[in-house]
């Protein structure tokens, strides 16, 4: 047999039984009655002991992590409630620190005192009685809003304590936000008023409470503005009818505007229909055609002239002199006959 080269020997996997026997092996458990994570040789113990009793049933991950040997189910519940309380306290502390930072940054913001604060605390904080009254009113308003909009504090399971510090910090935050909104609205109003008073083109300005108005009024500008307002605000002319009953009698109360609108009447519609029927008629075949009056006899006036003026009837001079009376008195000037004897409009 040919001997394998060193390259082929390096590719194989060789197990040394003596080396395997020399490895350390875990022969016994660290604590009786517990199930620990198996540790490799040379590894440290875990910081959190993942233990579980024999007689207890695992219902949540918190009981598995925090339970220790010697505690029952009641102890697990107490540990869970204590963890929740600690978490709530940490959140309250962090929020109070943020509130302190907000107070340091925003010196102009008025902070309302709490309901538990005493007058001595208010004086030490530097609040005057008037400011404390104002802030107290504002705090009452905001707290009433928060009480109406939010439910009662939730009671923790297994304990009789409530989330009172969390609710109080939340109400404080709402109060500060409301006060900031009020101050921003006041600043905007003051800015608008200042822009109105500083405008040079304004004819009239707001008079100060303790001084006189020294800016002259431009009458022409005031009149122009008044006329523009009148033009923009077009009056609505309406007629209102009210029926009132007094002592058993019905009375009609009519209020009219100075320029009443034209009231629609059915007579106008009837007149239009009559005129429409006079203009059009039906022929022998049932088609709608223009109606021609047959009062005047048919005359051929193609080459006829106006006897009084000696002009053609179609000339603008004749029409301007006589006007519509010429057309009404002489209808034969409007109509003529064609080659078949039918009456047609004169062209």
Swiss-Prot record:
Gene giving rise to this polypeptide: Aunip
Pfam families on file: AIB
Protein function: DNA-binding protein that accumulates at DNA double-strand breaks (DSBs) following DNA damage and promotes DNA resection and homologous recombination. Serves as a sensor of DNA damage: binds DNA with a strong preference for DNA substrates that mimic structures generated at stalled replication forks, and anchors RBBP8/CtIP to DSB sites to promote DNA end resection and ensuing homologous recombination repair. Inhibits non-homologous end joining (NHEJ). Required for the dynamic movement of AURKA at the centrosomes and spindle apparatus during the cell cycle.
Keyword Cytoplasm: yes
Places the protein is found: Nucleus; Chromosome; Cytoplasm, Cytoskeleton, Microtubule organizing center, Centrosome; Cytoplasm, Cytoskeleton, Spindle pole
Protein family (similarity comment): Belongs to the AUNIP family.
InterPro entries to which the protein is assigned, alphabetical: AUNIP
The keyword Phosphoprotein belongs to this UniProt entry's keyword annotation: yes
Location of the region described as Interaction with AURKA in the Swiss-Prot/TrEMBL record: 182-347
Official protein name in the record: Aurora kinase A- and ninein-interacting protein
Chain spans, region Interaction with RBBP8/CtIP: 273-347
Biased amino acid composition, Polar residues: 301-322
């Amino acid at each position: 047999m040919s001997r394998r080269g060193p390259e082929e020997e390096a590719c194989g996997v060789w197990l040394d039984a003596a080396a395997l026997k020399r490895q350390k092996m875990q022969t016994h458990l660290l604590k009786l009655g517990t199930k620990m994570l198996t540790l490799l040789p040379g590894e440290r113990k875990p910081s959190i002991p993942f233990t579980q009793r024999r007689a207890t049933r695992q219902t949540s991950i918190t009981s598995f992590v925090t339970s220790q040997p010697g505690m029952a189910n009641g102890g697990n519940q107490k540990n869970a409630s204590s963890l929740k309380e600690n978490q709530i306290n940490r959140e309250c502390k962090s929020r109070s620190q943020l509130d302190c930072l907000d107070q340091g940054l925003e010196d102009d913001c008025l902070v309302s005192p709490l309901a538990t604060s005493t007058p001595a605390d208010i004086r030490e904080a530097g609040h005057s009685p008037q400011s404390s009254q104002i802030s107290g009113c504002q705090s009452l308003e905001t707290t009433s809003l928060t009480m109406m909009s939010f439910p009662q504090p939730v009671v923790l399971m297994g304990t009789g304590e409530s989330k009172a510090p969390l609710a109080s910090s939340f109400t404080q935050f709402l109060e500060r936000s409301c006060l900031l909104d009020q101050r921003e609205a006041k600043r905007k109003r003051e800015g608008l008023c200042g822009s109105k008073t500083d405008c040079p083109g304004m004819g009239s300005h707001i008079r100060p409470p303790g001084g006189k108005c020294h800016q002259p009024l431009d009458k022409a500008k005031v009149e122009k503005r008044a006329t523009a307002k009148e033009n923009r605000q077009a009056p609505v002319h309406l007629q209102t009818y009210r029926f009132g009953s007094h002592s058993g009698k019905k009375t009609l109360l009519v209020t009219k505007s100075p320029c009443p609108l034209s009231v629609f009447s059915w007579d106008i519609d009837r007149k239009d229909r009559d005129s429409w029927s006079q203009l059009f008629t039906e022929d022998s075949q049932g088609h709608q055609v223009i109606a021609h009056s047959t009062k005047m006899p048919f005359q051929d006036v193609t080459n006829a002239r106006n006897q009084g003026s000696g002009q053609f009837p179609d000339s603008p001079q004749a029409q301007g002199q006589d006007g519509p009376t010429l057309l009404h008195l002489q209808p034969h000037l409007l109509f003529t006959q064609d080659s078949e004897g039918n009456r047609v409009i004169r062209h």
